[in-house]
Amino acid sequence: MGSQHSSALTFCQRKKDDNPEDLLADRDQEEAIAQFPYVEFTGRNSITCHTCQGAGYIPAEQVNELVALIPHSDQRLRPQRTKQYVLLSVLLCLLASGLVFFFLFPHSVLVDDNGIKVTKVTFNEQDSLVVLDVTATLKIRNSNFYPVAVTNLFSQVQYMKAVVGSYTTTNVSLIAPRSEHLVNFTVKAEVGGPSSYVYFYCTLPAIRVHNIVIFMRTSVKISYIGHISQSTLETQHYVDCGVNSTAAQSLFLVPRGPHL
């Protein structure tokens, strides 16, 4: 303990014996070093730092304008599970694309004949004509996951290869997704004439049932997602031209369609 105390006293005495001029010289040297500008040494010469302009600090207004340099070996530049995230993103994109393709891919729109429901018969004695108001029905089935529009319907009635009546209309109906819809329309047909036996046959009281065969060709245009298709049906029906009737019997059906 005695030796440590004596050495401490000796050190203090040496400090007191130091020359005050040496202490002033040391302070001047520290201040000179503190005022020395911040520079970058490239080996042969030095370049003043462009960021702080040698001041050793960054102005507050430039804090949001400067970019920090990160070493290439920094772990922040190597995110974990990158491959898993990329693979998951690719799978999700493929799944979404497949679902969009499945739901938006155009499916068939089926048009079927549902028969003749009502036949109204009137006679024109002056011109020897049998006037038939034929009400037919189409069954349209939409298999898509979006609505389709029936934009045009055209029907033509023939008897013995002669056109005796026609009907056309636009903006018929809008069919909901995955559903079917019945479309009714009435065609007026005039059969007979002065040189025809039809009027005599249909008005002959000795015959109980006055059946004639009419031929109908019906075309339907359907629009969906910028795509237009056309279906054509050709049917033949038995019609009693002597009296008004309902639910006329179909002879056979020849479907044609859809056509692009």
UniProtKB/Swiss-Prot annotation:
Cellular location(s): Endoplasmic reticulum membrane; Membrane
One GO CC term on file: endoplasmic reticulum membrane
Residues bearing glycans: 184
Record's keyword terms, sorted: Endoplasmic reticulum, Glycoprotein, Lipoprotein, Membrane, Myristate, Transmembrane, Transmembrane helix
Bilayer topology annotation: Multi-pass membrane protein; Lipid-anchor
TM ranges: 85-105, 196-216
Subunit note: Interacts with TMEM106B.
Pfam family, one: TMEM106
Positions of N-myristoyl glycine lipidation: 2
Species in which this protein is naturally found: Mus musculus
Protein name (Swiss-Prot/TrEMBL): Transmembrane protein 106C
Domain of life, per lineage: Eukaryota
Family under the similarity heading: Belongs to the TMEM106 family.
UniProt key word Repeat: no
